[in-house]
Each structure stands twice: as C-alpha cells, then as structure tokens.
Amino acid sequence: MRYRPVIGLEIHVQLSTKTKAFCSCPADVFELPPNTAICPVCTGQPGALPVPNEEMIRFAVKTALALNCKIHKYSRFDRKNYFYPDLPKGYQISQYFYPIATEGFLEIDGDEGKKKVRIRRLHLEEDAGKLVHEGDSITRASYSLVDMNRCGVPLIEIVTEPDISSPREARVFMEKLRSIVRYLGVSTGDMEKGALRCDANISVVDTETGRQSNRVEVKNMNSFRFVEKALEYEFERIVKAMERGEDVERETRGWDMTTKTTVSMRGKEEESDYRYFPEPDIPPVVLSDEYLEEVKKELPELPDEKAKRFMREYDLPEYDAKVLTSSKELAEFFEECVKVVNRPKDLSNWIMTEVLRELNERNIEITESKLTPQHFADLFKLMDEGKISIKIAKEIFPEVFETGKMPSQIVEEKGLVQISDEKLIEELVKKAMEQNPKAVQDYKSGKKKAAGFFVGYVMRETKGKANPELTNRIIQKLLEGE
C-alpha cells in the first residue's frame, strides 16, 4: 500500500469515584438535571480552593500498573489555560510537567499479528463542562447550551505514541483499553455516556516518496465503530489531497454522525498556546513504595492473564478465550457455568453464539439478563437424555433468555419432547421404503443423499419431533441391511 496512516490516540477515561477530582460534588452526573451538581470549587468562584481526591490518585496508579507504565513517585498538577464556554475557571487542572506515569504499552491484535502500542504518558486532570448543541447536527445547531455538571469530574488522559497503523487497530486498542478499565473497576468505559472519549491524531505517509502530511486531530467519536469510520474517512480525505499534490491544514476536525464526514472545528493548538504553569493551590503528589505495593496487590486478574488461564485450564482455543474474557462479567458467568456443567468447550460455543447474540440484540450486559448457569444445566440435560435436539434447544433459547423460564418448562408447555421410540421410528422408515422403492434404489446405487428423503418423511410424520440422530442411524441400518 502506497499510503500509510500514522495514528496516535489521546484517550480520556472518566473515573468512577464517588466525588469529583477537587471538591465534594458527586462525580456520577450523567443522568442529573443540568447544572445541579456544581459548587464554588468546580465552577471557579473566587476564593474557592481545590482538595485532591485520594481515590482518583489510586485509580490512576492502578490503571498505570495495568498498562505497564513507569509510575512516578513525585507528580504535580498544572494549569492548562484556554478559553471555552464550558470551562468556567478559564483553565483546567491537569498534569503537564510531571505526570503520574509514563513509558507504558498495551499489546493488541494488530493487522499483522501481536503488536505493542507504546503509551507516552498517563496523567490526571479534571473534566470540562458539556456543550449541548440544539439542532440536528453539530454543524447546523442554531444555538448551544452549557451544562457545568461535568466540570471537575476526575479523568485520566492516556496518550499513545503514533504506533497505530490503521483505523481498525485504533478501534481494537480502544476496545481492549475499555476491557481493562472495567476489569479494574476504575471506570464504566461507556463511550455513549462520555466515560471513555477518544481524540485521534492522524497523518499519512507516502511510502514511495517519504513525504508525510500535516497532522490532523479528529474529535467527537463516541463509539468504537465511529472511531474506525472517522479515521477511515480522514485517511481517504488526506490521501486524495496528497494525490492532488496538496497538503491538508493542521487543524482539529469533528466527526459528524449525520453526514458521516469530518468537519473543520478550529486550527490545531500548539502546547505553548495553553501557557501551562504549576497549580499553586495543590501540593505535589508523593507516592511511597509501600503505597505502590498496596495498590499493586489490589490488581485483579486482567483480560490477557485470564485468557491464558482459560486456554490452559479449560483447553479452549485462543479465539474463544479472548472473546469470553473481553468482559469481566462474561468471563465470570462462563466460570460459574463450568462449575455446574463441566463442559467448557460446549459452554463456550453456546455463550459465544446464542448468548452474545441475545445480549447484542438487546444491548445489555450478561449481568442484566435473567440467564443463570442452571439454565444451561437444564438445557444440556434435555439434550443428553435425547429429549430435545440441538435444533430445538436453539429454537427455545431466545424464550429462555427473555423469560428466565427453565428450558424443561418451555419444552413441556410446548410439547417439544422429541420421540426416541426406536420401534416407532423403525416402522415409519420401513413404511417410507415400501412406498418409495426408487429412493431405496437410488441410495443403493451410491446416491447417499437419497437418505434425506426418508429423514424428511419421518420428520413430517412426527411433526419434527423424531430424534434426528436416532432417525439417521435407523435409516442407515435399514437401507444398508436390505
């Protein structure tokens, strides 16, 4: 490929602390009425002084450890100065000169195999407020409203090196990061609610000439799919400009979900534009070795470690293990099921197909469903005893999922118990053979597909309730024994 994208990400993770970064206002503000979770500190009233949230610092250290970062025992807060309607203080408290962590990495499944994406820095900062645009899209809004509730909500910003080589890799990185912060319990990672936000910097290299375009920042990507789509669009836009012999402007662009394009928002700021200087009202953060060891002990088994254990303990393929461990709750559900039904691969197949389909259709997590390990124990027992076929099991599963009823109850209510009476099935097959000697002759002359006729006959006569495995066995025995 002649043109190659070079992508770096700046990710904001909203921390699930009880209170905001520097005041006692609640941090969970998503569903609150506008401007109801504010105080003099988070709205920048004169004389109000910030007090750092210790839980915020602990969450940042946990995340840094999970991302293989170097933790700095000494870090400091700084003021990032800029004007925007949703920033009442006129500056944002962040960490610029001395971040809490640097030099980490996250391994992802890249386009050409396993790939380490380096993390340049991880630092703490407070969130700004939120602009609500009144109109059908950001470009056609007639006016905007400001909600200050989000001001002061604690964030960690994670900045990667430009190691990402495609829009798909950017999406994969984001998905894996969300999985990690959820495992840690430091964030919900919900992009639609703004708990995980991604800005991407993209430039394009012409591999034939070595020429590289200006860097463009892309914002407003509030789903993993939009991260990929926005970067695909921007890559194509930059390539077209380069093919015309032009260069794109160094600017910030926003993804417009309605038009499926990026639109210019403003010129790209340089770091000097923010006039960073040390925050005079907050002392430095000093971490002891004992504190770091204490936090390290709190780390749970993370997705990669859990996937390796699933492969080792349950003899699962790598793909299955990664899908099952992508969500902490799904992994826990799988292990609870294995305790009840010790058939890991069969359970994995059901969870990865039937369960995930039902969850995705409803856009819910496994913890929000009525499904329990006992449902699988009951379902597998019905199949093992020959009472239902796998086809019937899959047909009743949506109802099991929706209602929480036991499979055996649904089977009984609907009269779905399959017929496993060997004598009855044998009589039906013999009857079919007597009535259709040509199909018998076809089978004997090598046309094995002719057996399907007899299967169909038995299923029609039993209204689909005949045990298919037993039926096939009897058909084969009678046809080959003639």
UniProtKB/Swiss-Prot annotation:
Record-listed E.C. numbers: 6.3.5.-
Q: Which reaction does it catalyse?
A: L-glutamyl-tRNA(Gln) + L-glutamine + ATP + H2O = L-glutaminyl-tRNA(Gln) + L-glutamate + ADP + phosphate + H(+); L-aspartyl-tRNA(Asn) + L-glutamine + ATP + H2O = L-asparaginyl-tRNA(Asn) + L-glutamate + ADP + phosphate + 2 H(+)
Enzyme superclass (EC): ligase
* UniProt keyword list: ATP-binding, Ligase, Nucleotide-binding, Protein biosynthesis
Pfam families found in the cross-reference section:
GatB_N, GatB_Yqey
> One GO molecular function term?
ATP binding
- Gene Ontology biological-process entries: glutaminyl-tRNAGln biosynthesis via transamidation; translation
Listed under subunit, the entry gives: Heterotrimer of A, B and C subunits.
Family classification: Belongs to the GatB/GatE family. GatB subfamily.
- General function of this protein: Allows the formation of correctly charged Asn-tRNA(Asn) or Gln-tRNA(Gln) through the transamidation of misacylated Asp-tRNA(Asn) or Glu-tRNA(Gln) in organisms which lack either or both of asparaginyl-tRNA or glutaminyl-tRNA synthetases. The reaction takes place in the presence of glutamine and ATP through an activated phospho-Asp-tRNA(Asn) or phospho-Glu-tRNA(Gln).
What is the name of the protein in this document?
A: Aspartyl/glutamyl-tRNA(Asn/Gln) amidotransferase subunit B
Its ancestry begins with: Bacteria, Thermotogati, Thermotogota, Thermotogae, Thermotogales
- The UniProt gene name for this protein comes to gatB
